[in-house]
C-alpha cells in the first residue's frame, strides 16, 4: 500500500519546538500585539523587515539546534510531506521528504513569486545577538526595505503567499494523487496543503487517518481517528 504521511507542528513538539500558534508566536510592535498569522506575511516582511526578522529569529531560528525525536526517526523511511520548517525530518535521515512550507536553515533572494531562484543556506551562526536587529538586516542584505533580487528572504511560505515549484507543490500533488492512504499527524487542518490533500482524498476515495489528541473532525466518511499523540501512535504501530 502506498501510504503518504502529512505532518504538522504536533510532530515536532516532542523536540521542544512550540506549535506555530502558541503563545510565544505573538509579537508586540509599539503598543500593538500581533498574532503569528499577522507576523508571518510577505507584507510584514516588506513593510517592517526589522520586526519581521526579529520575530522570525525569536520564533524559529533560536530552535535551530534542536534534534529529531522518535517520531522523526520512525518517519525517516516513509513517503512524507511536512508542514514544519524545522528540518528535523532531514536530520533524522529522510532524504526524500517534501518541506512544503520551506526550511528554517535556508533562504532565497527576495523575488517575484513563481520566478526560479536558488535556495541557499542561511548562516544563522553569523548573527550577533548583542546587536540583533542590525545583524539580521545585514545578513539578509536589507537597508530600509527589502529590494527584489538584492535582499534575501527566509525560505518560508508566508500566509499571503502561494505554493510554487520552489516548494515542490507539483511533486506534492503527485504524491497525494498516487496515495492509497493518507495519514495526517499533528496537524490542525488550518493551512491550504491539508485542504488540498483532503480534496484529492475525497475525489479519489482515498483512505484517511488522523493522528491527534484533539483531532479536527473532517467532512469525510472514510476517516479513522487516532486520539493520541504521534509518539503514542508510533509506539502501537511498531
PLM feature spans:
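Conserved catalytic core of sirtuin-type NAD+-dependent deacylases
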Residues: 1-238
Amino acid at each position: 500500500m502506498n501510504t503518504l504521511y502529512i505532518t504538522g507542528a504536533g510532530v515536532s513538539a516532542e523536540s521542544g519546538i512550540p506549535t506555530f500558534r502558541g503563545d510565544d508566536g505573538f509579537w508586540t510592535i509599539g503598543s500593538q500585539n500581533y498574532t503569528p498569522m499577522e507576523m508571518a506575511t510577505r507584507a510584514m516582511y516588506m513593510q517592517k523587515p526589522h520586526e519581521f526578522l526579529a520575530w522570525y529569529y525569536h520564533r524559529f531560528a533560536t530552535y535551530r539546534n534542536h534534534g529529531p525525536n522518535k517520531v522523526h526517526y520512525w518517519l525517516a523511511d516513509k513517503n512524507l510531506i511536512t508542514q514544519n520548517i524545522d528540518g528535523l525530518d532531514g536530520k533524522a535521515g529522510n532524504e526524500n521528504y517534501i518541506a512544503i512550507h520551506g526550511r528554517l536553515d535556508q533562504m532565497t533572494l527576495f523575488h517575484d513569486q513563481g520566478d526560479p531562484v536558488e535556495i541557499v543556506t542561511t548562516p544563522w551562526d553569523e548573527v550577533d545577538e548583542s546587536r540583533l536587529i542590525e545583524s539580521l538586516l545585514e545578513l539578509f542584505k536589507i537597508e530600509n526595505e527589502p529590494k527584489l533580487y538584492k535582499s534575501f528572504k527566509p525560505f518560508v511560505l508566508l500566509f499571503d503567499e502561494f505554493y510554487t515549484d520552489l516548494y515542490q507543490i507539483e511533486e506534492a500533488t503527485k504524491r497525494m494523487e498516487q496515495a492509497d492512504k493518507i495519514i495526517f499527524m499533528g496537524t490542525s487542518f488550518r493551512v491550504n496543503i491539508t485542504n488540498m490533500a483532503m480534496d484529492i482524498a475525497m475525489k479519489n476515495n482515498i483512505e484517511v487517518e488522523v493522528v491527534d489528541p484533539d483531532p479536527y473532525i473532517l467532512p469525510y466518511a472514510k476517516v479513522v481517528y487516532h486520539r493520541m499523540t504521534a509518539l503514542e501512535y508510533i509506539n502501537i504501530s511498531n
